[in-house]
Amino acid sequence: DVGEEFDGLWVGEVVDVGAMYLFIAFTLVINLNRWLTEKNSGLSKHNQLLLFISLSIFSIAVVALFKGTVGIILFAVLVIVSGHFESEIYRKYNKGLNYKPLILLIVFFGIAWGIWWLDITKTVCDQNNHFIQGHAIWHILNSFCFLFLYKYYKQISSINN
């Protein structure tokens, strides 16, 4: 049945994109809390968790309910807000962190994003190639972003303890 296949694809897309929103919601909550902590008003663990869950549910609901560019715009806004808090922390409260993992994250994400755009706009797209496609490269490169984020946040945890 075509309707069931379509629903399965839609669910797969929501799960696929949902992982991106979990990732960016995590960075946004962590960076917001770091920024607030520097201002002596950090969030409790409970409030961090509530904010993370709320952002995640809201973001994934937006993707599930709206097709098209709404989800892309929301993701971009969350990236910008998370990056804003990180840049404010760097600018005002620089604690001599090693920013190499964060820079590598940005580079890998930028390359992955560029490949994703080339794939989604069908600029570079071979639908007969079932071995590797732009979307697959997007996922592979983004998997390294998790490693780089871990390495970056691990040093912050070490400094704060």
Please tell me what each predicted stretch does.
Residues D1-N161:
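Multi-pass alpha-helical transmembrane bundles in non-GPCR membrane proteins
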